[in-house]
Each structure stands twice: as C-alpha cells, then as structure tokens.
C-alpha cells in the first residue's frame, strides 16, 4: 500500500463513514495520520533522529501478546530457544507496553555503550538507565500519552515495568551434528534488572520529583541486548504501538529484509511458533497476523510481503532503516 493509497482510503472513509466510531484496534486514517506517513516516507529515521534499537533475540523469540496464565514462557525459532520466568506474585511481561519498554531499554543501552567507548561514562555507569524525574516525560519517550483512571495508561505501564524488571530470561542455542549425533548447547540466563528505583506520582505524573528514577540492568542481560541489535524507526513504532502483533511483525520484517536475497515463502507454522502466542490455532493466528501486517504496511509501504495459503510470501526490498557500515553495535 502506497502513501497515495492511504490518502485515497482516508478520503473515501471521510466521505462514506463520517459518523463511524473507530476503535483503538483500527487505524484512524485522518489528516494527522497521513501527515505522519508522509513524514516517514520523505525523511529517513536517521535524518529525523528517530532511530531506536531492539535486541536480535527479542525478534527471533517474542513475548506473550496477552496475559499468560503461567509464570513461565518459552518460544522457539530454529536453534534458538528463549525461556522466561517471573515470580508468581508478579507475573510475566506481555503486550504493547512491555515491547515498547524493551525497545527503550535496548536503545538506551546502545547509547550508553557508545558513551562508554568514547570515555564519557564509566563501566560502573554503563548499565544504569535513567528514566527521569517525571512519569509523563518518560511515557512520552515511549510514544505514550499519560492518562490515569481505570482505562488509563499509567497503571498498566507501571505494572509492565514491575513484571519486566523482575523477569529472568534464558537464551539457549543448540547445534546438532547429524553425522556423529553430537549436540552442543550454549545457554545464558539473566535477570533483566539487578536494581531499580522508581519514584513517580500516579496522581501527578507531570511533576518533576526530587529523586531520579532509574533501572540498573544485570551484566548478562546488558550484554544480550547490545549484541548485534537491530535498528528501528521510532516513528513507525508510535503508529502501530497499540498492536503487539504489528510491533512484532515490524521488528521481524526490518531484520528479515536486511539480509533477504530472494523471494521466500515462510510457512504459517514457522511464524506461529516464533510469534504466535496465545492463539487457538493457525487460522486464528493468520487472521491476527494479517491484521498486524496491514498496519505495518500502511506505515512501511515498501515492505513487499503478501499472505498466501501456504505462508507469507516476502520479496527482497530496501530495509526500512538502512544498514550502517561503521559501528557494528549501532546497526545490524
């Protein structure tokens, strides 16, 4: 779908559906939305200073989309297996907010690593990420509006922060030698945060408090997220932030397109194993995936991906965020 298609759809919907109430799950194709699409199309993320990062392992194996019943979670993709565990009194992170938090954490960790390399900060400071004195400003950095009440954003974000910081993640890579039957397994486990200090006001999120809020990542988790991170366009994330599936698809497609050399069909079973959490069957997953893909392609018209009966047909195209050749820790 091109920018012109989006504008045409917007014009048609304005004429035909003036009185239709659009839910949060549907993109409201208004003038402001189209302006954002045009800005993404005309100016790169680098030029707009809107580059963020996500750890590669979080693309290969994703978080739950909705609240899981258990406090353990596993995802498998090829020879990589991710296992997550959280205290029963807290629970596992899930949904949109957890994903946006992980992008923010990955981005800040990469920036701190760059500062360390330049001698701006020390080894003792590199894993400490400052969240700021104002909850509203932190939420704006995530692309969220600060709102209270039963259906507001403040309480669920705080809950996802608590869940994420207390979670332990293990990554296992398995290699099998088919000739002699040898199996080699490499595994690393890490709690996300060693220490956190959150001091915000739920009643007055806009206030600057005396104490700075911060989180200190564990050494092993810090190393996991700075290892070959994938660059993202934060403007795209903000457009699709309400859909966990769309966020997963965008991050995955950005990485996949970066090395795709020929037309490929990815089976639905493989996609479901990687990111199809909490779905009853392949049919349900396909429907949700296609909805998410449509949201992504509105923001990224150059993504040449088409759902078929067998799987997703994806063709080589320009990465949404171009490769950077110089700094390996700041690109693919």
Q: Model segments located where?
A:
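Charged, alpha-helix-forming regions
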Residues: 1-332
């Amino acid at each position: 779908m091109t920018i012109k298609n989006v504008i045409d759809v917007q014009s048609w919907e304005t004429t035909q559906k003036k009185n239709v109430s659009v839910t949060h799950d549907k993109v409201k194709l208004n003038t402001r939305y189209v302006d954002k699409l045009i800005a993404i199309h005309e100016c790169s993320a680098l030029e707009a200073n809107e580059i963020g990062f996500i750890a590669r392992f979080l693309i290969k194996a994703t978080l739950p989309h909705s609240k899981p019943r258990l406090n353990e979670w596993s995802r498998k993709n090829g020879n990589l297996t991710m296992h997550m565990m959280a205290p029963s009194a807290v629970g596992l992170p899930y949904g949109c907010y957890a994903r946006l938090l992980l992008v923010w954490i990955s981005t800040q960790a990469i920036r701190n690593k760059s500062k360390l390399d330049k001698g701006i900060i020390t080894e003792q400071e590199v894993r400490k990420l400052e969240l700021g004195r104002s909850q509203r400003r932190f939420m704006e950095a995530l692309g969220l509006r600060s709102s209270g009440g039963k259906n507001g954003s403040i309480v669920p974000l705080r809950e996802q922060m608590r869940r994420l910081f207390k979670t332990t993640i293990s990554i296992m890579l398995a290699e099998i030698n088919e000739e002699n039957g040898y199996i080699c397994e490499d595994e690393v486990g890490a709690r996300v945060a060693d220490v956190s200090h959150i001091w915000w006001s739920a009643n007055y999120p806009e206030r600057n408090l005396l104490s700075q809020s911060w989180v200190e990542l564990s050494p092993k988790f810090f190393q996991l997220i700075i290892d070959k991170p994938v660059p993202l366009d934060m403007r795209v994330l903000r457009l699709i932030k309400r859909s966990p599936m769309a966020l997963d698809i965008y991050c995955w497609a950005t990485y996949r397109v970066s090395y795709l050399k020929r037309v490929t069909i990815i089976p639905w079973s493989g996609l479901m194993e990687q990111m199809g959490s909490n779905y009853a069957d392949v049919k349900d997953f396909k429907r949700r995936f296609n909805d998410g893909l449509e949201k992504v392609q509105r923001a990224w018209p150059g993504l040449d991906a088409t759902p078929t009966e067998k799987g997703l047909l994806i063709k080589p195209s320009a990465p949404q965020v171009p490769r950077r050749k110089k700094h390996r820790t700041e690109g693919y």
